Amino acid sequence: MNGAAPIIPDVRVEPDPSLVVRQLGRVAYEPTWRAMQAFAAQRSAGTADELWLLEHPPVYTLGQAGKREHLIAATDIPVVPIDRGGQITYHGPGQVVAYVLVDLRRRGYGIRELVARLEQAVIDLLAASNVEATRRAGAPGVYVDGAKIAALGLRVKHGCTYHGLAFNVDMDLEPFAAINPCGYPGMAVTQCRDLGLNWSVEQTERALTDALQRAIYS
């Protein structure tokens, strides 16, 4: 990309009354995961959906389909087996994580449709700054020139989701070299900074919140 770095789009939408947005800052992984589980277990038909925006300290998470052989190098970063779909991924500072706590029964669509909508939110956000992003058949997430910029993994219980997506903004990508990201040997990863997008975590959280709200509730 040439010239000045694009400014992150600031297109605000009216808050959906059935959505509570929480910006949690940098929080440890395991307590946040347990809080998601508790929220999903305790919510009722009238409970508002929630969107949690946050960062995690360095951690690998291993999904239900995960195999430890996809951790291919020794590391001091903890590995946490969890209950989302998918394989192994990395979370760390400078990555915006959006946990999507949505009642799909109220929305009237299923988990595959939600995954497509979450992917489209990231694709649209990048397109607004002239970055072309795509999906990849059989490998949920968002890619730029074949490199993964956003990972997705969800769990559904009683029609309600938790977990969500992780969007690489301005982070140390080196820990990805110790794993086969999402179980794919040799998969490249990228981030906004490397695409010439000098976005802060705070700016990205605001813009991603709006993009996700449009995608989920349209």
Swiss-Prot record:
Pathway: Protein modification; protein lipoylation via endogenous pathway; protein N(6)-(lipoyl)lysine from octanoyl-[acyl-carrier-protein]: step 1/2
Other notes: In the reaction, the free carboxyl group of octanoic acid is attached via an amide linkage to the epsilon-amino group of a specific lysine residue of lipoyl domains of lipoate-dependent enzymes.
Function: Catalyzes the transfer of endogenously produced octanoic acid from octanoyl-acyl-carrier-protein onto the lipoyl domains of lipoate-dependent enzymes. Lipoyl-ACP can also act as a substrate although octanoyl-ACP is likely to be the physiological substrate.
Entry protein name: Octanoyltransferase
Main location: cytoplasm
Keywords attached to this entry: Acyltransferase, Cytoplasm, Transferase
Classification via Pfam families: LplA-B_cat
Name of the gene this protein is made from: lipB
InterPro entries recorded: aa-tRNA-synth_II/BPL/LPL, BPL_LPL_catalytic, Octanoyltransferase, Octanoyltransferase_CS
Catalytic activity, reaction form: octanoyl-[ACP] + L-lysyl-[protein] = N(6)-octanoyl-L-lysyl-[protein] + holo-[ACP] + H(+)
Source organism: Thiobacillus denitrificans (strain ATCC 25259 / T1)
Gene Ontology terms, MF aspect: lipoyl(octanoyl) transferase activity
A Gene Ontology biological process term: protein modification process
Annotated positions for site Lowers pKa of active site Cys: 148
Record-stated family: Belongs to the LipB family.
Active site: 182 (acyl-thioester intermediate)
Keyword Transmembrane helix attributed: no
The enzyme's E.C. designation: 2.3.1.181
Positions bound to substrate: 84-91, 151-153, 164-166
GO cellular component, one term: cytoplasm
Subcellular location: Cytoplasm
Domain annotation BPL/LPL catalytic: ranges: 45-218
